Design a protein with these regions (language model features):
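Bacterial Sec-dependent N-terminal signal peptides
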Residues: 1-22
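Extended, hydrophobic alpha-helical segments in both membrane/secreted and soluble proteins
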Residues: 444, 513-527, 540-554
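Short linear Ser/Thr-Pro motifs
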Residues: 6, 15-16, 221, 569-572
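Aromatic-residue-lined binding/catalytic grooves and analogous aromatic/hydrophobic interfacial grooves
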Residues: 21-508, 526, 546, 550, ...
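Acidic/histidine-rich catalytic neighborhood
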Residues: 547, 551-601
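Short loop-to-helix capping motifs
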Residues: 533-534
Length: 653
């Protein structure tokens, strides 16, 4: 019955797409707006002037800030993705602006001009300082303990591209923007809707102009790895379009025509030489198409479908060669994109849409949420719903939508075969971005995956597990250098090139986070706990958990009274350097419990299990403070008026 229902829905999607405006996509689970978007952010790295891109005066540090300069993109665009490529649909009438991403397009890494040694030799040899720090704690010299930690538990790697050339840590960077001029004017436009259908993982733009109903459909297929964009109307000959592409402005490349209706852009990032390829092909019904000067010009067509795909030469590596600058290079994007595009065009729009829906629905439709199905609300634009909700009006549908939007975003940004969701999932509109749009290991990447297994999306957890595997070998060097410890760990920020060291800053409230690795490793057990995949635990998961637990044991301070505490430690982005931050103890407890249970499941490592149990039994317990609160630090300095956004110590609950 489920398969029959799925077939019916997918058939309805395909058939309704034949006639522009034939389906009300605002029904069901949908985020939608009733006013068109601005075009002001177009090619934001040049202030909306892509025509200025001449390969000179490249904005190397553009976006080196915590603020996105394109507010409409951030709050009004429609995000679609398949775990590898992503796009944001802006939905203007005069032109369609689409920001485009491929998740592995990163600056930085070992292949910059200064090579592999420059990239990897960043860990300080600081393990011998731990005894001195712990002695300072014992003697009550908090200032000395903090000073020694600040001076010795950072690295020499800046977090800002403006402060280092070549930039080692790097950043996730845009693959550019597509711009489709329509020849239409907003004057006289009516019935506008810009819709993100969570039921079908499709973005739709609909409006009427001069008694013509126009419709644009967008989806990104995971099976085909292609972005599909369909421009149609309910009258023939109404598609007059000019398609152009503004590439990443800190790369060097060239656009060539591919036949009468295709474009291929091949380039390499200036920072590290990472190669990437973008392919576009237009298929029209009626009218004419001219392919000239890097633009596709369509006149008088009934319908236009654009097929787009992209790839980089990045290769994930679980055992990187620290001497080889190209240890993360291994894919030919010319070949991969050529095959993907040829296959997609051969299938055609309807078959791709059906395949896309079947693939997506198999994940999304596993969970339904009905908070109060007897209470009905009107079909309002999402912005109006939010305004009403903030005024105190109940809206159970909005709450259901919010829940399912989280699941949708995870499906769109995390599928097997690529990197996990980053700070912005898979979506980015600039050269650089807030916090390098990296992998923040002090709660952000973990938060991305909280709904994975618990909402029946365990497959979406696999990219995170593969990402953790890429950190192990570099993380062993970090664990040994800073703590003289077995196993592996990571620090606050990671990239796709195995970066596990702390950064340059001496602000230890955020830059000192050795529990990042064990916290990541707890997700390994979570995946097993939900799936009960014993083969996975035996062949992949257990060693990751075991080595992380061993790091946690070696990192702890075994005090003369027999107890274990975390010194030095911090509560992420908040408060002083401590000798027993609750967050750290909570993660240690969790990873030790995971290791104990995993070893019992497999019937292995009785000796290590005994050690883990002994440490767990003697770990300093949680403390209750003067307000009846769970203390965040080893001393009772919590302030009930403190509204800091990080409350990581609550992990213990």
């Amino acid at each position: 019955m489920k398969k029959l229902y799925s077939f019916f829905i997918s058939t309805l999607l395909v058939s309704s797409a034949v006639c522009a405006g034939g389906t009300d996509y605002t029904k069901g689970l949908a985020i939608w707006f009733d006013a068109p978007n601005t075009l002001q952010g177009h090619a934001v790295w040049y202030g909306g002037r892509p025509d200025m891109w001449k390969g000179e005066n490249k904005p190397e540090t553009a976006g080196d800030t915590a603020r996105n300069p394109d507010a409409a993109w951030e709050s009004q665009s429609l995000p679609i993705g398949n775990g590898s490529i992503g796009a944001n649909i802006m939905g203007s009438v005069e032109a369609e602006r689409i920001t485009f991403n491929e998740k592995t397009l990163w600056r930085g890494g070992p292949n910059t001009a200064k090579g592999a040694d420059y990239y990897w030799n960043v860990n300080k040899q600081s393990a011998h300082i731990l005894d001195e720090i712990r002695k300072a704690f014992t003697e009550g010299d908090q200032a000395k303990a903090e000073r020694l930690t600040r001076q010795n538990f950072n690295s020499e790697v800046p977090y800002e591209g403006s402060r280092e050339k070549p930039f080692r840590f790097g950043s996730f960077t845009t693959m550019g923007e597509f711009y489709v001029e329509t020849g239409l004017n907003i004057i006289g436009m009516s019935d506008y809707k810009r819709i993100l259908s969570l039921d079908s993982a499709m973005a739709v733009v609909q409006f009427k102009k001069d008694d013509v109903a126009y419709q644009r459909n967008y989806f990104i297929s995971y099976p085909a790895n292609v972005l599909v964009m369909r421009f149609s109307a309910d009258r023939p000959g109404k598609q007059n379009l000019i398609f152009s592409y503004a590439p990443n402005p800190v790369s060097t490349g060239s656009m060539v025509a591919q036949g009468d209706n295709g474009l291929v852009y091949s380039a390499a990032l200036d920072n590290n030489g990472m190669k990437y390829v973008v392919r576009i092909q237009a298929e029209t019904k009626g009218g004419t198409l001219v392919n000239r000067n890097g633009k596709l010009t369509v006149k008088g067509a009934d319908e236009v479908v654009f097929y787009v795909t992209a790839d980089t030469d990045y290769k994930a590596n679980f055992a990187p060669d620290f001497k080889n600058p190209k240890t993360y290079v291994g894919v030919n994007p010319v070949e991969t994109t050529g095959q993907w595009l040829a296959n997609a065009v051969a299938k055609g729009y309807s078959a791709l849409l059906n395949e896309h829906y079947q693939d997506y629905a198999a994940l999304f439709n596993r969970v339904k949420l009905n908070l109060n199905p007897t209470v009905k609300t009107g079909n309002l634009p999402t912005g109006q719903r939010l305004k009403n909700y903030r005024k105190g009006q109940p809206d159970y549908y909005l709450e259901e939508l919010y829940f399912q939007f989280g699941r949708y975003l995870l499906i769109a940004s995390s599928r097997p075969g690529n990197m996990p969701a980053n700070l912005q999932g898979i979506w980015h509109n600039n050269v650089d971005g807030p916090w390098r749009v990296d992998y923040h290991n002090n709660i952000n990447i973990q938060m991305n995956y909280w709904p994975a297994c618990s909402t029946n999306l365990e497959e979406c957890m696999l990219p995170l597990i593969d990402f953790i595997r890429t950190l192990v070998k570099p993380g062993e060097k970090t664990a040994q250098s800073y703590f003289g410890a077995r196993g592996w760990t990571a620090s606050i920020s990671a990239n796709i090139f195995g970066f596990t060291a702390p950064l340059e800053s001496q602000d230890m409230s955020w830059n000192f986070n050795p529990m990042a690795g064990p916290w990541l490793a707890t997700h390994i057990w979570e995946y097993y706990d939900y799936t009960r995949d014993l083969k996975f635990l035996k062949e992949t998961g257990y060693e990751l958990i075991k080595s992380s637990a061993n790091f946690a044991v070696d990192y702890l301070w075994h005090k003369p009274d027999g107890t274990y505490t975390a010194a030095p430690s911090t509560s992420p982005e908040h408060g002083p350097i401590d000798q027993g931050a609750t967050f750290v103890h909570a993660v240690v407890r969790e990873i030790l419990l995971d290791a104990i249970k995993a070893s019992e499941e497999l019937g292995v490592d009785k000796k290590e299990r005994k050690e883990w149990e002994q440490v767990l039994a003697n770990l300093v317990p949680y403390k209750i403070g003067r307000y009846g609160q769970l203390m965040e630090w080893s001393v009772d300095i919590d302030d009930p008026k403190d509204e800091h956004r990080h409350v990581n110590h609550m992990f213990s609950l």
